[in-house]
């Protein structure tokens, strides 16, 4: 339950940071914008198509319930609040007009309450293992955590103390 609360709070805070001010006018403007954008879809690698798991269901649910994830023209990454077999489940969002059909590399920085989980960690997203990431889709990536990182991630309770960013995104030939 705690993790579900963290997930919802993260998504709400992320959504709030995109708005100019709180109130009824923002809500109707946001609904209009979301309706005009392409629909965000959750995808899995071909080897997982037709299969189900708690993580796949979580990815589908978050994508359906939070179409505001990411920003138009950009890629983004979010922590789902889930950890499975010592691996953190992060959601990669592609809201660009480009279908990702080649392997990607990017740097990930992630901290909580001033304590580093990853510092410019090079992450590889391989098409062979993870599948293509078409325009306006989301997918999950699982990052292995050592025991110290796992303890820190498990202790997270205040989303406002977390920072997570990706940089240096590039296609790999």
Predicted ranges, named:
Residues 116-159:
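Short, solvent-exposed, Trp/other aromatic-anchored flexible loops in extracytoplasmic proteins
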Residues 93-99, 113:
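Short solvent-exposed strand-capping/beta-turn motif centered on an Asx-Ser/Thr pair
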Residues 17-87, 97-101, 105, 147-151, ...:
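Membrane engagement elements in two modes
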Residues 12-15:
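C-terminal motif of bacterial Sec signal peptides marking the signal peptidase cleavage site
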Residues 108-112:
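Conserved aromatic beta-strand anchor motif in extracellular beta-sandwich/beta-rich domains
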Residues 73-80, 91, 124-129:
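Short structured motifs
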Residues 1-4:
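Positively charged n-region of N-terminal signal peptides that target proteins for export
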Residues 85-89, 138-140:
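Intrinsic-disorder/low-complexity, polar/charged segments enriched in Ser/Thr/Lys/Arg/Asp/Glu/Gln
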């Amino acid at each position: 339950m705690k993790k579900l609360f963290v997930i919802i709070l993260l998504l709400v805070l992320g959504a709030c940071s995109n708005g100019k001010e709180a109130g009824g006018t923002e809500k109707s403007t946001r609904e209009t914008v979301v309706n005009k954008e392409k629909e965000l879809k959750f995808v899995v690698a071909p080897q997982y198509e037709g299969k189900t798991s708690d993580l796949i269901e979580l990815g589908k649910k978050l994508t359906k319930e939070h179409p505001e994830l990411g920003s138009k023209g950009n890629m983004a990454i979010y922590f789902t609040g889930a950890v499975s077999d010592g691996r953190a489940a992060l959601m990669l969002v592609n809201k660009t007009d480009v279908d990702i059909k080649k392997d990607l590399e990017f740097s990930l920085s992630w901290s909580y309450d001033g304590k580093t989980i990853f510092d410019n960690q090079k992450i590889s997203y391989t098409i062979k293992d993870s599948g293509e990431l078409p325009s306006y889709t989301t997918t999950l990536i699982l990052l292995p955590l050592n025991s110290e990182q796992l303890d820190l991630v498990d202790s997270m309770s205040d989303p406002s103390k977390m920072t997570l960013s990706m940089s240096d995104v590039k296609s790999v030939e």
